[in-house]
């Protein structure tokens, strides 16, 4: 919204700064962090009163988790407030990529909010029907992908079929045109990203820091992919307009820093599905927009690992009656093996940093 002040630059030279994505990204980060810091305490107090017993604790979980009983959830509301308000202020709202990303973020956040509401009111870990939830997520994601695909096709970026194509790391010219099946592929990527972050969010601070790390990595990717000069130098595909997504990702980092202040152990609040689904969906949408869906598997490798541990556990148990892990997702497995919560969290953060660096290295290895 504030980018429109550039029109006043002839009279007020300061407004020239609003042209630059880097300036607006930094401003979005600061704004979202400030929003969460200022309104976080009041929101936590309100949620604690309204929820009473807070988020239900799994009966079969690690014994150390029972001391967390009574901690309020739905902290994703403060994260979403920071991201959305900051993005509305600093991002270019005429960009279909910005609008699509905010659509997914708010849509997934609403689904997560309803899921959290059911869990809190029923005091059960069984919330929204899994099939119904996935179906609605897929519809929202597919709509966003369709509009982003049309935008890329209309721009004629890197060829007339680029918008409907999948690109591959390490190969600068290799693309697979899926046609309108790309909508299904992109929808799957976004839904998968949302639910992967959701599965990771099981310990204080475990999900939010890797989300910020992935956001920083994809913020750089979005900026480079949206800049013709940098994209040509790195020999990555130029996607006009995606640079604006760096502003939203800056807002994610700021909101994440603000939330971590309250989510640091012992957590005063959990983000809940409200936050984890929204954040994962946001990152997935950026990956689709910038044509780095496969690179997301590397950068978000921690989330992939958590998801695979659940899939393997369920599949093997149904097939043999035995479990591969002591408990899934895998962060609980390490808790059961004797790791303290802080050891699991910090070691997983380290893994997230390493994977982000490996993912970013693919930009040059072509």
From Swiss-Prot:
Organism, scientific name: Sinorhizobium medicae (strain WSM419) (Ensifer medicae)
Its biological purpose: Catalyzes the initial step of the lipid cycle reactions in the biosynthesis of the cell wall peptidoglycan: transfers peptidoglycan precursor phospho-MurNAc-pentapeptide from UDP-MurNAc-pentapeptide onto the lipid carrier undecaprenyl phosphate, yielding undecaprenyl-pyrophosphoryl-MurNAc-pentapeptide, known as lipid I.
Location (main, coarse): membrane
Family: Belongs to the glycosyltransferase 4 family. MraY subfamily.
Gene Ontology process terms (BP): cell division; cell wall organization; peptidoglycan biosynthetic process; regulation of cell shape
InterPro entries (alphabetical): Glycosyl_transferase_4 (IPR000715), PNAcMuramoyl-5peptid_Trfase (IPR003524), PNAcMuramoyl-5peptid_Trfase_CS (IPR018480)
EC numbers on record: 2.7.8.13
GO cellular component: plasma membrane
UniProt superkingdom: Bacteria
Disulfide bonds: none
Keyword Ribonucleoprotein applies: no
Gene Ontology molecular function terms on file: metal ion binding; phospho-N-acetylmuramoyl-pentapeptide-transferase activity; UDP-N-acetylmuramoyl-L-alanyl-D-glutamyl-meso-2,6-diaminopimelyl-D-alanyl-D-alanine:undecaprenyl-phosphate transferase activity
Identification of the protein by name: Phospho-N-acetylmuramoyl-pentapeptide-transferase
Transmembrane portions of the chain: 27-47, 71-91, 93-113, 138-158, 174-194, 205-225, 245-265, 268-288, 297-317, 343-363
Cellular location(s): Cell inner membrane
Pathway named in the protein's UniProt entry: Cell wall biogenesis; peptidoglycan biosynthesis
Record keywords, A-Z: Cell cycle, Cell division, Cell inner membrane, Cell membrane, Cell shape, Cell wall biogenesis/degradation, Magnesium, Membrane, Metal-binding, Peptidoglycan synthesis, Transferase, Transmembrane, Transmembrane helix
Membrane topology, as annotated: Multi-pass membrane protein
């Amino acid at each position: 919204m504030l980018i429109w002040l550039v029109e006043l630059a002839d009279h007020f030279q300061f407004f020239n700064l609003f042209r630059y994505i880097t300036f607006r990204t930094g401003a979005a980060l600061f704004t979202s962090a400030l929003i969460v810091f200022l309104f976080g305490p009041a929101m936590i107090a309100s949620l604690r009163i309204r929820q009473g017993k807070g988020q239900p604790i799994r009966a079969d979980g690690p014994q150390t988790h029972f001391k967390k009983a009574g901690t309020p959830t739905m902290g994703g509301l403060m994260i979403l407030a920071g991201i959305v308000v900051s993005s509305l202020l600093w991002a270019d709202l005429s960009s279909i990529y910005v609008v699509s990303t905010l659509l997914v973020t708010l849509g997934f956040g609403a689904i997560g909010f309803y899921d959290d509401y059911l869990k809190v009111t029923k005091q059960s870990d069984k919330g929204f029907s899994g099939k119904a939830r996935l179906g609605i997520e897929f519809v929202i994601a597919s709509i966003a992908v369709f509009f982003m695909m049309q935008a890329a096709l209309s721009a004629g970026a890197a060829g007339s079929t680029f918008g409907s194509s999948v690109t591959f790391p390490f190969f600068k010219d290799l693309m697979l045109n899926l046609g309108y099946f790309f909508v299904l592929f992109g929808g799957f990527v976004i839904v998968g990203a949302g639910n992967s972050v959701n599965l990771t969010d099981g310990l204080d601070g475990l999900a939010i820091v890797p989300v910020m790390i992935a956001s920083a990595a994809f913020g750089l990717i979005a900026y480079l992919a949206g800049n013709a000069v940098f994209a040509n130098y790195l020999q990555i595909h130029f996607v006009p307009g995606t640079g604006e997504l760096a502003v939203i990702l800056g807002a994610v980092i700021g909101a994440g820093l603000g939330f971590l202040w309250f989510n640091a152990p012992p957590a005063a609040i959990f983000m809940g599905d409200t936050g984890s689904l929204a954040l994962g969906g946001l990152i997935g949408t950026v990956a689709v927009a910038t044509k780095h869906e496969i690179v997301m598997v590397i950068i978000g490798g921690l989330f992939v690992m958590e998801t695979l541990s659940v899939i393997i556990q369920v599949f093997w148990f149904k097939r043999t009656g035995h479990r591969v892990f002591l408990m899934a997702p895998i962060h609980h497995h390490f808790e059961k093996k004797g790791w303290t919560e802080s050891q699991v969290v910090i070691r997983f953060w380290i893994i997230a940093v390493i994977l982000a660096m490996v993912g970013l290295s693919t930009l040059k290895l072509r």
